[in-house]
């Protein structure tokens, strides 16, 4: 799922299209969504895929004017009998004009 936001007069507004200055949040994106965003913003799709790989470690990586900040974020799973805590990767990709955030799940 892709959500696009733009700040206007101090308010965060949801948008239909990617535009300069927008924040693009990708939650469990499929390959088509990854391809669309990466093609439009000229971002290497591997940076997005790294944010979806549960085995990735936290790091900062720079490539062709784009910066990936990869951190582990906590998640809570409850199976009805017990509560489990773990971490999943959360990617922040900075381009010249946009911010892309990527995660396997919705994290509140």
Residue ranges with predicted function:
Residues 1-108:
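Peripheral, non-transmembrane regulatory/ligand-interaction domains of membrane transport proteins
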């Amino acid at each position: 799922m892709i959500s696009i936001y733009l700040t206007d007069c101090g308010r965060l507004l949801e948008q239909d299209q990617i535009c300069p200055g927008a924040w693009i949040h990708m939650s469990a994106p499929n390959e088509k969504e990854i391809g669309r965003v990466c093609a439009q913003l000229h971002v290497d799709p591997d940076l997005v895929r790294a944010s979806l790989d549960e085995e990735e470690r936290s790091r900062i990586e720079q490539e062709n004017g784009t910066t990936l900040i990869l951190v582990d974020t906590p998640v809570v799973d409850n199976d009805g009998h017990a509560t489990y805590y773990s971490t999943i990767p959360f990617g922040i990709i900075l381009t010249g004009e946009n911010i892309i955030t990527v995660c396997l799940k919705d994290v509140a």
